[in-house]
């Protein structure tokens, strides 16, 4: 069977706990399906600043480039909030995206039937929600130049630049159409074309790409309307594609449809090298080390790795089935407590999912689907 080398970057806060859980589940996949996963660890974010003096050490970058895929935990925390801009933990995340050419961020948003009551929205709004946000990662206002703060004539000013090249827009929109073709065949392109020149270019390019996918429907939606529609009628969406900052904001909003940020995985795909997988949630320093963190987003990110980087579809389905089974049995970490069920620790949730992976059979999955 397969041999796969995975770079693990725990990062800060609960990143260490949730990546540890995902690694344990991947080890169970290896045992169940006969694969060998090799895990090698690197520093990123605040942990890297403390130990190496930089948010992304060269050793970490080298490790990632030599690996088949990257599993990331989370970066950041109040400890580093007063650092100068180049020594902020988030700079490590932005840098690794740029260095590995991680141009497409995929964030599935699914509301599990057993977690409908965990969402702050009415059950009839969220039950059956299943869409993907495709966020452009390497362009836009987070990377545009000039960027910074200056003092001119005694007045302090700050500037950021929202810049997109046509080819950057084209490749992310194309990715969205390819995804939609295998789903419900609808792409919603989100922009601010009534105000921003970059969004007008975005809309024009989306129209050009759409001509190559006549079987897929394209609609345009202004970002402010999209933010409202995600709450008003989330089931209308299939694939949402948008620029970097809009995607950053909308995906956090969409997380509440599933009940918790702790449920949302993500994949950041590279055009030429290893892709990176990480939970959408942050480092949550307030609960770090307390065995309270929800590991499911990290575990589902590992499932995305199995499917997208390694082509191991059955193995990914085994992990997803194990997560669904744990939730159906009423297990809940503290972030999901309002939905009822038995509150368990991080380690207990991981152990339950591991056991389900080891016991997994395709027949068991079929029986669950048709039960």
Swiss-Prot record:
An annotated GO cellular component: cytosol
SMART domains to which the protein is assigned, alphabetical: Iso_dh
Residues annotated to bind Mg(2+): 224, 248, 252
Residue numbers marked as site, Important for catalysis: 142, 192
InterPro entries associated with the record: IsoCit/isopropylmalate_DH_CS (IPR019818), IsoPropMal-DH-like_dom (IPR024084), Isopropylmalate_DH (IPR004429)
Requisite cofactors: Mg(2+); Mn(2+)
UniProt KW Lyase keyword: no
A biological process term (GO) from this entry: L-leucine biosynthetic process
Major localisation: cytoplasm
Job of this protein: Catalyzes the oxidation of 3-carboxy-2-hydroxy-4-methylpentanoate (3-isopropylmalate) to 3-carboxy-4-methyl-2-oxopentanoate. The product decarboxylates to 4-methyl-2 oxopentanoate.
Protein name, entry field: 3-isopropylmalate dehydrogenase
